[in-house]
From Swiss-Prot:
Its main location: cytoplasm. This is Endonuclease V. Transmembrane segments: none annotated. The keyword DNA damage applies. The gene is nfi. Keywords: Cytoplasm, DNA damage, DNA repair, Endonuclease, Hydrolase, Magnesium, Metal-binding, Nuclease. It is an enzyme of class 3 (hydrolase). The keyword Metal-binding applies. It comes from Archaeoglobus fulgidus (strain ATCC 49558 / DSM 4304 / JCM 9628 / NBRC 100126 / VC-16). The record marks 74 as: Interaction with target DNA.
Amino acid sequence: MLQMNLEELRRIQEEMSRSVVLEDLIPLEELEYVVGVDQAFISDEVVSCAVKLTFPELEVVDKAVRVEKVTFPYIPTFLMFREGEPAVNAVKGLVDDRAAIMVDGSGIAHPRRCGLATYIALKLRKPTVGITKKRLFGEMVEVEDGLWRLLDGSETIGYALKSCRRCKPIFISPGSYISPDSALELTRKCLKGYKLPEPIRIADKLTKEVKRELTPTSKLK
């Protein structure tokens, strides 16, 4: 596997983060599609699944699956180097000028403001929203019942949202080319009663189906 000095990787992330734009490249009312991307690992391979949904109807119109060799080890906060290119390869054929991307991974709510969603945004020059089930970075400050701001100092870098009655919050942050408030609004508009927004939930379901097909003895449900 490719090995690099962690200080050099941090420098790359910090340099990329300086290119982040926290303004809407596409007004939400002009969005026509949302693409969700999710990934899973089988031994030394990564399965990347992307689904394209109409917006705001949230109907699946296309999907893509890529299986590639893993070329980088698992290191927390450096997942963009492990998962970034495979995710880009799965998504790039589904996005157009009226599409945003939802990523199972962090955006700027990351110690160096450069999570997986940020990497994908900057590579494809498309708006991305990062969605995670755990808080990686940022102080939570309650805004209202079930909603918290994620702060880095005094700056809002995302939100934590209790997306269904009995679930723990999800963590939402822009990757690039979308504001934190628009990332929250888009996420809310993609919810259909489940913890995860539909683009991520359906991509996750597809990923599990593909993984089962590739590993017949898997107990994955």
